[in-house]
């Protein structure tokens, strides 16, 4: 809908255009879970269904000739993807961010920043039993690019103790997907 600016001064018009837009339909959609939980597949489905930009950390790392094991590069990629996500959200385009988000503080920071942009925030937590995670990881490890830097069972076992699963109180802080309303 075009704005009627015929009776407004140039200063008033500029002020109106600079006001933050209400981005009511725009969403930051986060996936959360351990490796092998199905985050990337879910992110693909959500991006297609919602017409959103999907940003998957691991895919960017592999494309840059790195691996998820390269912590300095991973941190740089995460930072840049998060900056890009915020710019895209400001434009009114939904973003699916596929990072894993193992800690509550990461999820809190992203939720708070997105709320500051005036967008809704969803968290899709995938809680998968350890044996199923390992079965999926073994299958993934057999194919490129993961066959060159496979996840070991000892890695998974250690990560389970580091992962901070969202509880019901935290999940209640996020918006429900539109199809759930």
Which positions does each model-derived feature cover?
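Conserved GTP-binding G-domain of TRAFAC-class P-loop NTPases and closely related GTPase folds
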Residues: 2-6, 20, 28, 45, ...
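Pre-Walker A adenine-sensing motif
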Residues: 9-22
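Hydrophobic anchor at the beta1->P-loop junction of P-loop NTPases
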Residues: 31
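P-loop (Walker A) phosphate-binding loop of NTP-binding proteins
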Residues: 34
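Conserved substrate/cofactor phosphate-moiety recognition/catalytic segment
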Residues: 37-93, 139
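Conserved nucleotide-binding/hydrolysis micro-motifs of P-loop NTPases
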Residues: 59-61, 102, 127-133
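Glycine-rich phosphate-binding loop used to anchor ATP phosphates in small-molecule kinases
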Residues: 72-121
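Conserved phosphate-donor/acceptor-positioning beta-strand/loop module used by diverse small-molecule
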Residues: 117-137
């Amino acid at each position: 809908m075009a704005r009627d600016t015929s009776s407004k001064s140039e200063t008033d018009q500029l002020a109106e255009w600079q006001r933050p837009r209400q981005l009511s339909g725009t969403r930051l959609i986060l996936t959360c879970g351990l490796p092998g939980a199905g985050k990337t597949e879910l992110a693909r489905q959500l991006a297609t269904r919602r017409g959103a930009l999907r940003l998957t950390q691991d895919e960017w790392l592999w494309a840059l000739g790195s691996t998820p094991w390269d912590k300095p590069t991973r941190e740089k990629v995460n930072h840049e993807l998060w900056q890009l996500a915020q710019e895209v959200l400001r434009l009114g385009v939904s973003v699916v961010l596929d990072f894993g988000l193992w800690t509550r503080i990461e999820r809190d920071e992203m939720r708070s920043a997105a709320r500051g942009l005036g967008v809704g925030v969803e968290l899709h937590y995938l809680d998968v039993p350890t044996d199923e995670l390992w079965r999926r990881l073994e299958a993934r490890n057999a194919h490129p690019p993961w066959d060159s830097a496979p996840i070991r069972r000892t890695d998974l076992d250690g990560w389970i103790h580091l992962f901070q699963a969202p509880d019901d109180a935290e999940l209640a802080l996020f918006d429900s997907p539109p199809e759930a309303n």
